[in-house]
Amino acid sequence: MSSSMCLARCSASLSAGNFPSRMFMGRLHAQRRTRTLQLRCAASLLPDQPTLAASSAISPVPSDLPEVLGDALHRLGAIYVLADASASTAAAAVMPTAVDSAAGAAPQRAGGWVAPVADALEQVLYALQEGLDKLHVPYSYGYSIILLTLIVKLLTYPLTKQQVESAMAVQALKPRIDLIKDRFGEDKDKIQKETSVLYEQAGVNPLAGCLPTLATIPIFIGLFSSLTNVANDGLLDTQGFYFVPSLAGPTTMAMRQSGLGTSWLWPLGPDGAPPIGWEDAAAYLTLPLLLVAVQYASSSVTSPPIDPKDENANTQRALLVFLPLMVGWFSLNVPAGLSLYYLANTVLSSAIQIYLKKLGGANVVMNELGPVTKPGSGRRNGVAAGEWSVWKPATVLTTAEAAKARAEAEEAVERAREAAEEAAAAAAFDNASVSLSVDDSTAAIAGTATMAVTAGAPAAAMDPSKVNRRCKRRRLTSLVQDGSTASAAVAGASA
């Protein structure tokens, strides 16, 4: 159906007192926007015609249309000025094939398995918008997008909670995993085996956190597709949101798919202004900038601390820096309604993560482990390799208890390291020997005995916190006895 036929049908319906349906008006808006884009792109490629520029003037409304339809088209004119500016400016900077592709790309609705989910969420969005309109809430479409995002987050909250609890359980075992890595060094097979045994004994599945995330992906794809359908149908063309002129601007999904999603922002004109002017550009840039700031704040609050010794530490830091920038760049290429959804989703996700991780909302279910023993030391006293000495029944740990368990595990790791230093000190004592050589010279014998008696001085000067007291006392007593024996030998030799 052509645009003129659509206008004639609307005129006849309005004259008869029948208002066109929301879906029909959406198709009308989408067809008119596509036709405007085609005409402007074609005109900009004519060699004898100057490049079209954005104008604040609104095209005159045909006088034979009813007053209601004329007012609607008048309010729709602003968004088409944005489309005109984007198309005319981009046409001078890109190849003709790209312009033809952008002009001929008609809005398409989601298909395949996404279609039922997108259609259902779209109907919920319509119901929310109509309900807000009845309550005379301003910016009803913007608030309906936020409410729909909130509903989806609440529906997926159990899956999010399960994912967070699994991640916290794995994080609580990290000190013990680090001890395993220190014990086996570069033997990755042994590390993997011991780590698997630890997960099994602790009752933790490290892959359990992936399943809830995968389950929520189709839902959010459907939500994104439903908002895309609304934008393609033109239902957001006249819907602003506070400082944002239109939730359908400043670009379209068709232009984004053709690589012209940011043509509203650059290239800059001769006066240094973007194609749509600094005033509108600044208004549309507010949402992407807010989104980047919220992403950075969320990452700094909810992300676990990065271990400098981790081999993936640099990759994790790079993701924390570049991921918000990538999301901000993507929001520049989509209508403002989708940017509003990204912002609402980020804020709600951050609030849920803070509640679960910082405020005790998550319960970590795992077997409480006893003191740390040497993993991988083989079977000793009935304890197999990789097992830990004390086991308790499965308990439910709150966030505070999980933090306490993590601190106790770190203390156990420190005690194990001190035990390793103690073992090294004991080995040093074992290597020390008292050697006596009876020579013809009495002075040489006396000097050898003196060296033997003073052989324990460095060991006695060691830090008491690093050497077990009982081991130290036993070793020093042995040295004193050896020294006494050496002195007696010297006295006998002298006699």
UniProtKB/Swiss-Prot annotation:
Keyword list, A-Z: Chloroplast, Membrane, Plastid, Thylakoid, Transit peptide, Transmembrane, Transmembrane helix
Segments passing through the bilayer: 76-96, 207-227, 274-294, 318-338, 442-462
Top-level taxon of origin: Eukaryota
Is this entry keyworded Thylakoid? yes
GO MF terms on file?
membrane insertase activity
Q: How does it sit in the membrane?
A: Multi-pass membrane protein
> For side Lumenal, which residue ranges?
228-273, 339-441
- CDD domains the UniProt entry points to: 5TM_YidC_Alb3
Q: Name one GO cellular component term.
A: chloroplast thylakoid membrane
Q: Which InterPro entries match?
A: YidC/ALB3/OXA1/COX18, YidC/Oxa/ALB_C, YidC_ALB_C
A Pfam family assignment: 60KD_IMP
Q: Which residues lie on this side of the membrane: Stromal?
A: 97-206, 295-317, 463-495
| Keyword Cytoplasm assigned | no
Q: Where in the cell is it found?
A: Plastid, Chloroplast thylakoid membrane
Q: What does this protein do?
A: Required for the insertion of some light-harvesting complexes (LHC) proteins into the chloroplast thylakoid membrane. Essential for the assembly and activity of LHC I and II. Its function is probably partly distinct from that of ALB3.2.
Q: How does it assemble?
A: Associates with the LHCII complex and with the psaE subunit of the LHCI complex.
**Record's family?**
Belongs to the OXA1/ALB3/YidC (TC 2.A.9.2) family.
Q: What's the name of the protein?
A: Inner membrane ALBINO3-like protein 1, chloroplastic
Organism, scientific name: Chlamydomonas reinhardtii (Chlamydomonas smithii)
